[in-house]
Design a protein with these regions (language model features):
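Compositionally biased linear targeting/interaction segments
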Residues: 1-293
Length: 293
């Protein structure tokens, strides 16, 4: 009986060590795969979106494809769900917050992501809106001093925008955050890429400055004539100079910032979800923000 007890204890101990080793190996595979995919996709993000745009033009699509690319990759027995995003084709919450205020920012979230997502907002900004801090000074895009100053980030993580527990409960799944933020960003340049953004994102931004009807006319004019430049559209469709200047601050035709969600799922054990945003400053230096969930 003693021998059986000893052997049983040794077997259990060996099993535990084996499971721990398997867990460590699985975690290593998840981390290695995540970092590899992250590095490759973010490095080639600009080209990937350009190729997709070329394909959309060949197919003569009336509306641009969404500002995200989804794919699934299997590496070493681990499945990686990948969501690559163009951050400059999403509504910049930092730019909206500073230029049009928290109420309009919350409204824009509802317009783009839906009412349940808007109801999950819980703004915890690092600083006050720039306009309030400057006693409602109107920002002018041609002011040299203003151009030299980068808008500080009020929101540096999704936890400063949403009550994440409420958001997950409202949408009913653990992937609530990637789904809710596919057209929202805290890491873009602050200007929405008019060529790549969805109709909803464009209307959310433009209607914060001009009446909804004016934003729709601007969008329709662009859809009718997609070769028209943003400057020409604003010049012909927005008569108020101050509104036109504000829209120039909020809209652009380029993208330089990208992000990636990666959900690494092994056959056993818990999944590993990460979000990484790549942002370039005015000098072209790239900074990465990385979060694990």
């Amino acid at each position: 009986v003693l021998v059986v007890t000893v052997l049983s204890g040794l077997a259990n101990q060996s099993l535990r060590r084996g499971l721990q080793a398997a867990d460590a190996e699985r975690t290593l595979q998840q981390r290695w795969g995540t970092r590899t995919i992250e590095r490759v996709f973010l490095t080639e993000a600009s080209r990937l979106f350009e190729l997709r745009e070329e394909a959309a033009k060949e197919l003569k699509l009336q509306t641009p494809p969404p500002p995200v690319v989804r794919t699934r990759i299997d590496l070493g027995g681990v499945a990686f769900d990948v969501l690559l995003g163009d951050e400059d084709a999403k509504v910049s919450l930092n730019a909206m917050y500073h230029r049009v205020g928290p109420e309009s920012t919350a409204k824009a979230i509802g317009q783009v992501a839906g009412r349940p997502v808007q109801q999950s907002t819980r703004f915890l900004p690092a600083i006050r809106p720039l306009r309030i801090a400057r006693e409602n000074l109107v920002l002018q895009p041609n002011n040299d001093e203003e151009d030299a100053e980068m808008i500080p980030d009020a929101f540096r993580s999704w936890g400063e925008v949403f009550d994440l527990a409420t958001l997950e409960k409202s949408l009913g799944n653990q992937a609530a955050l990637p789904a809710a933020t596919k057209e929202l960003t805290c890491w873009g340049s602050g200007q929405l890429n008019f060529d790549r953004a969805s109709d909803e994102a464009i209307l959310a931004v433009t209607s914060s400055v001009v009446q909804d009807g004016g934003g729709r006319r601007l969008l329709q004019r662009y859809r009718d004539n997609p070769t028209a430049t943003l400057d020409i559209l604003l010049q012909t469709e927005v008569t108020n100079p101050r509104n036109r200047d504000q829209l120039k601050e909020l809209l652009s035709e380029t993208s330089t910032n990208f992000s990636i969600w990666i959900d690494a799922q092994a056959k056993t054990g818990r999944s590993m979800r990460t979000f990484t945003a790549m942002k370039r400053d005015e000098e072209g230096v790239t900074q990465e923000s990385r979060f694990s969930f």
